[in-house]
């Protein structure tokens, strides 16, 4: 998730879940294989692969494992016959939710996603029901840094926006295809980001209260536990006050 003040509780909760290293690695490897199969094995010429490589390295995947996954995709590995599927729906409190999946069996995947929604008070929607609320962006995050220096370097490199939060954290937003190029330019200027990811950024937010927040988090947990689910995006916002009660 992009940002800190807006998304900190979600990001930190997800980071704790990512301790399930085996499942996370399996999902990243699946994305590496698929991205390489569809767009070739050169990350500099394949934005989707570059984003997957960045995510793999951020999760401490070894270069050897990463390169083997790319080689499988380029070589047309029989296990790489996956397709990207996007599901949309509404969760507790009217939250808009997008689920990005990689699957070789649509029927299995939609059944798992629908089950999660039904268990948590949400509804799986039709194509386009919430997609218009989100924009696909690259998000390069700094936990701290000099705002003017980062902003100047980022905008010069082609970034679309730079946002500074109350806690001093800074997010650089880019066209998703340009994220790798902008990140490289920032690093060349001596500015090493703490994370970089492709995300779906919502244009509106849905405030969660003490009743709806835990239901939303449970839904996200259930969706992320589905083997075919790669990413879950939502526009729910949980205030610090509500988060403290969870």
Swiss-Prot record:
GO terms for molecular function: DNA binding. Residues 1-20 are annotated as: Disordered. HAMAP family: Transcrip_reg_TACO1. InterPro entries: Integrase-like_N, TACO1_YebC-like_2nd/3rd_dom, TACO1_YebC_N, Transcrip_reg_TACO1-like, Transcrip_reg_TACO1-like_dom3, YebC-like. GO terms for biological process: regulation of DNA-templated transcription. The gene is yebC. Keywords: Cytoplasm, DNA-binding, Transcription, Transcription regulation. It is found in: Cytoplasm. It comes from the Bacteria. This is Probable transcriptional regulatory protein YebC. Belongs to the TACO1 family. Disulfide bonds: none annotated. Its main location: cytoplasm. GO terms for cellular component: cytosol. NCBIfam families: PRK00110.1, PRK12378.1, YebC/PmpR family DNA-binding transcriptional regulator.
């Amino acid at each position: 998730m992009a940002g800190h003040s807006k998304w900190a509780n979600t990001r930190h909760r997800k980071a704790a879940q990512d301790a399930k290293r085996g499942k996370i690695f399996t999902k990243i490897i699946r994305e590496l294989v698929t991205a390489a199969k569809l767009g070739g094995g050169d990350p500099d010429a394949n934005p989707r692969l570059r984003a997957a490589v960045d995510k793999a390295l951020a999760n401490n995947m070894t270069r050897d494992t990463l390169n083997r996954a790319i080689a499988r995709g380029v070589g047309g590995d029989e296990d790489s016959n996956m397709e990207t599927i996007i599901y949309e729906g509404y969760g507790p409190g009217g939250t808009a939710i997008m689920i990005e999946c990689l699957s070789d069996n649509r029927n299995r995947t939609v059944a798992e996603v629908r089950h999660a929604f039904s268990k948590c008070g949400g509804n799986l929607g039709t194509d386009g029901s919430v997609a218009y609320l989100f924009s696909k962006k690259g998000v390069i995050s700094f936990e701290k840094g000099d705002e003017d220096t980062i902003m100047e370097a980022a905008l010069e490199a082609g970034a679309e926006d730079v946002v500074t939060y109350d806690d001093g954290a800074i997010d650089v937003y880019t066209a998703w295809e340009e994220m790798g190029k902008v990140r490289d330019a920032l690093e060349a200027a001596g500015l090493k980001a703490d994370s970089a990811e492709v995300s779906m950024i919502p244009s509106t937010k849905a405030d969660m209260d003490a009743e709806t927040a835990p239901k939303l988090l449970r839904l996200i947990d259930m969706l992320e536990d589905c083997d075919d689910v790669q990413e879950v995006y939502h526009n729910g916002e949980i205030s610090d006050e509500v988060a403290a009660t969870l």
